[in-house]
Amino acid sequence: VKKQKGTDISLDEAQKMYDVKTDIFHSMPTAEIFPGVKEIMQKIKNAGMQVGVVTGSGQRPLIMRLLNDFGEYLDEAHIVTAYDVKRGKPNPDPYLMGLQKAGNLKPWEGIVVENAPLGVRAGVAANIFTVAINSGPLPDTELSDKGSNLLYHQMTEFCKEFEALIVTAKQTAAENTPNV
């Protein structure tokens, strides 16, 4: 609030704002799953990779929805919420925590898939290969200018190219790994 309105608010005022936001969130109709999301999760699983979700939310109903909708690909141990980090997106902390929860992976061992500018910035700041999915009304530059490595307009487009990207990534890694 200080940044946006130039004024401080009390903890009580902040809690009231949060409660109103939560009430609005819960009164909204349930959003449909974007086409291609379950397919990309299956492809990630088939590639021997771990699916994780990084969200700026800490809303328990959202976490339960994720587990309900994507439980065959995801478990709660691999969800990063606002409560897991001190600094949220666009800072790298949420994605670095995601790497930690996935088994202490290095940034080059992960892939960020994001549809929001702050998330793209966070993935890039964490030095993780970042794919932007511009599934909304933003100009492409709102995502590409934040540093995304690739940009698609639908998850289904990314899904179609996923296996080829993984093959290329593995070949590149093998070519750049020094022989010991």
Where are these regions (language model features)?
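Short, acidic loop-to-helix structural element flanking the phosphoryl-transfer center
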Residues: 26-53
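Short, mixed-charge, low-aromatic patches
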Residues: 1, 17-23, 50-58, 117-118
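A metal-dependent, Asp-based hydrolase signature
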Residues: 1-25, 35, 43
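Short glycine/serine/threonine/alanine-rich loop segments
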Residues: 7, 49, 128
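Generic secondary-structure transition motif, activating predominantly at the C-termini of alpha-helices
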Residues: 5, 22-25, 29, 45, ...
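Asp-based, Mg2+/Mn2+-dependent phosphohydrolase catalytic module
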Residues: 12, 38, 42, 58-180
